[in-house]
């Protein structure tokens, strides 16, 4: 037993330095990952539409007569961690009180590409890369067809839901209708 005590006392400085380095590495790793993702809703609009006599649509004041729904939202997202993060599986989720009725993947307005006078194409928003200690703004939009609109008419709340790189679910209230 004395042998071990002698060895430890002889190498006390080296062992202390190694333990200090290990503890510092662990704490640095933990602190870099520490930080929240915060959402700020800048704008949220929901339009209830019905077909008019011509080629267009009319915006209706109530969801009862709507045949289509158009949703616009501008959201700022802040990553408070010192490492980049990613949000996946982004969805507009429609609830009736606390029950999920339907969820749809929004389109990214930044990728709008017009290919005709009345036509366009947008990419779906599947993931968002969040740089460290920065805020980004996203503009998202979704047109719901008649089938989806029938389901959404039963709802009264809409949320934005997404998962981070660890699978943690974020649920952000957008509005009531």
Swiss-Prot record:
Superkingdom of this protein's organism: Bacteria
A single GO cellular-component term on record: plasma membrane
Transmembrane regions listed in the UniProt entry: 11-31
Main subcellular location: membrane
Membrane topology label: Single-pass membrane protein
Cellular localisation: Cell membrane
Keyword vocabulary terms for this entry: Cell membrane, Membrane, Transmembrane, Transmembrane helix
Name of the protein this chain belongs to: SPbeta prophage-derived uncharacterized protein YopI
């Amino acid at each position: 037993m004395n042998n071990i005590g002698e060895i430890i006392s002889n190498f006390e400085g080296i062992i202390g330095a190694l333990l200090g380095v290990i503890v510092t590495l662990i704490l640095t790793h933990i602190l870099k990952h520490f930080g929240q993702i915060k959402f700020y809703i800048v704008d949220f609009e929901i339009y209830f539409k019905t077909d008019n006599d011509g080629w267009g649509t009319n915006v209706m004041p109530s969801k009862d007569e709507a045949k289509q729904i158009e949703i616009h939202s501008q959201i700022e997202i802040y990553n408070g961690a010192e490492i980049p993060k990613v949000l996946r599986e982004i969805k507009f989720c429609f609830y009736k009180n606390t029950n999920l009725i339907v969820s749809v993947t929004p389109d990214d307005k930044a990728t709008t590409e017009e290919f005709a006078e009345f036509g366009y194409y947008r990419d779906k928003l599947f993931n968002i890369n969040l740089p460290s200690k920065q805020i980004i703004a996203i503009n998202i939009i979704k047109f719901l067809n008649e089938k989806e609109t029938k389901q959404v008419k039963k709802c009264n709340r809409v949320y934005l839901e997404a998962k981070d790189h660890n699978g943690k679910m974020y649920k952000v209230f957008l509005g009531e209708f």
